[in-house]
Amino acid sequence: MATVEENKTEKRSKLMEAAHSLFTSGSTLKPPTIDEVVKMAGVAKGTFYLYFKDKYDLMDQLFLKKLAECVNSALFKTRQQLAGRQVEDAERVNAFLDNVFMYIDENKAFLPLIRDRVSSCYRLMLKGREAELKEAYDSLVKLFLRHGFTEYESEMNIYMLVSMLAPVSCDSAIQGEPYKLDEIKSGMQRLTNKLLA
């Protein structure tokens, strides 16, 4: 028999899965309505409000979950690729960006979530609401600190990079224009390498 916590986790997951399914299968890029989400998830409407303030809070949390999957997948692959090797920070960042772009290319369905949610989700991430991203975020801050940036400047650099990466990678991965995804990846790597020089 499932515990109360397991039931809560399951219901929250069902709501998020329903929202993701509705969002990625729809013809518009608008968040689904709460009624659509609870109907697909098979839960009462009141249950929705136990986990989310409104549909925008749901979309923010869904974005953070998908972002965490992307970052954690890229981190895992980067660690595997560089295991046992001494590498410069620039090579480490380039390998990480390679893996982020590979994930983006293989998971295009979640990209429309990114377009308009970067700044609100970044604020949530800074508040520590997304523990799955904390390790990657802290690693990036330390990387910039090693290169002479203050903590504030490091956080600002991460925000600027994420804010640039999200929308341009969406356009490139989904539409293939105005530049190909590989071109954007190379540009981001050059930009990051210059920041760390």
Language-model features and meaning:
Residues 72-75, 103, 121-148, 155-159:
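Amphipathic alpha-helical packing segments from all-alpha helical-bundle domains
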Residues 99-123, 167-171:
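Amphipathic alpha-helical segments used for helix-helix packing
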Residues 1-10:
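N-terminal intrinsically disordered/low-complexity leader segments
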Residues 11-22, 37, 62-66, 70, ...:
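Generic hydrophobic, amphipathic alpha-helix propensity
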Residues 61, 76-105, 161:
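Hydrophobic alpha-helical connector segments
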Residues 21-29, 106, 148:
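Basic, amphipathic alpha-helical hairpins
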Residues 25-57, 61:
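Helix-turn-helix
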Residues 4, 145-191:
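Hydrophobic/aromatic-rich alpha-helical bundle segments in the mid-to-C-terminal region
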